[in-house]
C-alpha cells in the first residue's frame, strides 16, 4: 500500500513539475514578431558619440513603443547628424520613397530634428502614407513642423535625463508597468 502511495505521489509531483515547466515556458515566449506586411515605424537614432558611434538610442524602448503603437519598428542604422543633406535624412527619404509599408516616423534627439527635414522632403502622396510622427528629446521641434499630419507626438526629455526619453515615451504609451523587452 505504501509503495502505491509513494508512486502516486511521485507521478503527481512529476505531473505538477511538467505543467509548471510548460506554463513557465509559455510565459517566457517573446511576443511574435510583427509580420513583414505590418506597417513600419522607421526609427531615427540620435547623434553619434564615442559610446554610440552609430547614434544614440535606447533601441529596445523605441522598438517596444513601435510594437505597442501597432507598427513593426525598424531602426535606421545610421547616426542622426542633423541637417537637410545629412546621410540620415537622405537614407530616410530613400526608404520612404522605396518602401510603401513605412507608415510612421520616430525621431530621437538628432533623429527628431531630422524628422522635420524628412517631412519637408516628402511629396504630398508620401506624406499621406505617414500616419504618425513621434519626436523625443529634440527641443524646438513642434507639431507645427509637420503640416497636415494629424497625429504628432512631441515629448521633451524626462527628469531622468535625455537617454531616458524613449523609455518614458514607452511608459506613456503602454503604462508604467510596460516591460522593457517584448515577452516579459
Describe the role of every protein-language-model region.
Residues 45, 79, 137, 155-158, ...:
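Residues at the C-termini of beta-strands that transition into short coil/loop
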Residues 26-101, 160-169:
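Active-site catalytic motif of lipid deacylating hydrolases and related acyltransferases
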Residues 18-28:
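Membrane-interface motif at the C-terminal end of an N-terminal transmembrane signal
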